[in-house]
């Protein structure tokens, strides 16, 4: 399974990249807004920010359109695609979005169909030619719905028909989401920086390391004697 980081923060991306396990990046307007210095960011600055991300990570970088109409999505998406060959156009799963995804697919532009909350949405996006589809598991969990069940359904459907659209598990809240995604056969998990940090941690590892270090001190003292 591939690991993407879900952030627009350059420092977080650089730190995650140092681990050597990062395969790509996903961003959205909310994540970009977090890094805006004065509460807003120009569109040119946004494009420049995406370019900087592409320089850090040699892998897919999802940049989301902010328009809601098909024609406007197409214009915006084609402009974003020119930034770098690794840019993937992130499009919400709406009627207009599906039309835009179909257009991008015909033009050979990679897309990430986002805000998927049902199997039917994912299937429709795949039929339109989406490169990726992003089901949001955490947000479903928030409303007492099993988000991982959606992943299981989508993965099963896509396997039935050898659909090439890759499943990106999004809205990841904890390491359990990542592990379950891998067990279900999802292609990608896009993970916030804080959760990536949690993946490597376990209290028994900390206790074991503490014991090893104590024993190492005994060995060193014995050598001196």
UniProtKB/Swiss-Prot annotation:
- What are its GO cellular component terms? cytoplasm
Main location, first listed in the record: cytoplasm
**Top-level taxon of origin:** Bacteria
Keyword line: Cytoplasm, Pentose shunt, Schiff base, Transferase
Enzyme kind, highest EC tier: transferase
Any one GO molecular-function label of the UniProt entry: aldehyde-lyase activity
> For this chain's UniProt record, which GO biological process terms are given?
carbohydrate metabolic process; pentose-phosphate shunt
Instruction: From the Swiss-Prot or TrEMBL record, state where the protein is found.
Output: Cytoplasm
Q: Where is the active site?
A: 90 (schiff-base intermediate with substrate)
Q: Does Transferase show up as a keyword for this record?
A: yes
**Tagged with keyword Nuclease:** no
EC number(s) stated in the UniProt entry for this protein: 2.2.1.2
Part of which pathway? Carbohydrate degradation; pentose phosphate pathway; D-glyceraldehyde 3-phosphate and beta-D-fructose 6-phosphate from D-ribose 5-phosphate and D-xylulose 5-phosphate (non-oxidative stage): step 2/3
The record's listing under Pfam families reads: TAL_FSA (PF00923)
What this protein catalyses is: D-sedoheptulose 7-phosphate + D-glyceraldehyde 3-phosphate = D-erythrose 4-phosphate + beta-D-fructose 6-phosphate
Q: What does this protein do?
A: Transaldolase is important for the balance of metabolites in the pentose-phosphate pathway.
User: Per the similarity annotation, which family is this?
Assistant: Belongs to the transaldolase family. Type 3B subfamily.
Q: Which PANTHER family match?
A: FRUCTOSE-6-PHOSPHATE ALDOLASE 1-RELATED, TRANSALDOLASE
Q: What is this protein called?
A: Probable transaldolase
| Lineage of producing organism | Bacteria, Pseudomonadati, Chlorobiota, Chlorobiia, Chlorobiales
Q: What is the gene name?
A: tal
């Amino acid at each position: 399974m591939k690991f993407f980081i879900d952030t627009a923060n350059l420092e977080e991306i650089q730190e995650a990249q140092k681990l050597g396990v990062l395969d790509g990046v996903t961003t959205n307007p909310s994540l970009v807004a977090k890094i805006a210095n004065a509460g807003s960011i120009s569109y040119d600055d946004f494009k420049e920010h995406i370019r900087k991300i592409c320089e850090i990570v040699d892998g897919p970088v999802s940049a989301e359109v902010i328009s809601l109409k098909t024609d406007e999505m197409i214009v915006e998406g084609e402009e974003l695609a020119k930034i770098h060959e690794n840019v993937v156009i992130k499009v919400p799963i709406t009627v207009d979005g599906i039309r835009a995804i179909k257009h991008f697919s015909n033009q050979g532009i990679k897309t990430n169909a986002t805000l998927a909350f049902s199997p039917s949405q994912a299937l429709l996006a795949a039929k339109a030619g989406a490169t990726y589809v992003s089901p949001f598991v955490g947000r479903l969990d928030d409303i007492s719905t099993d988000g991982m069940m959606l992943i299981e359904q989508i993965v099963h459907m896509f396997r039935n028909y050898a659909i090439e659209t890759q499943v990106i598990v999004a809205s990841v809240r904890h390491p359990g989401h990542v592990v379950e995604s891998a067990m279900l056969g999802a292609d990608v998990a896009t993970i916030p920086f804080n959760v990536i940090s949690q993946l490597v941690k376990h209290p028994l590892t900390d206790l074991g390391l503490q014991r090893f270090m104590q024993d190492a001190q005994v060995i060193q003292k014995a050598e001196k004697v």
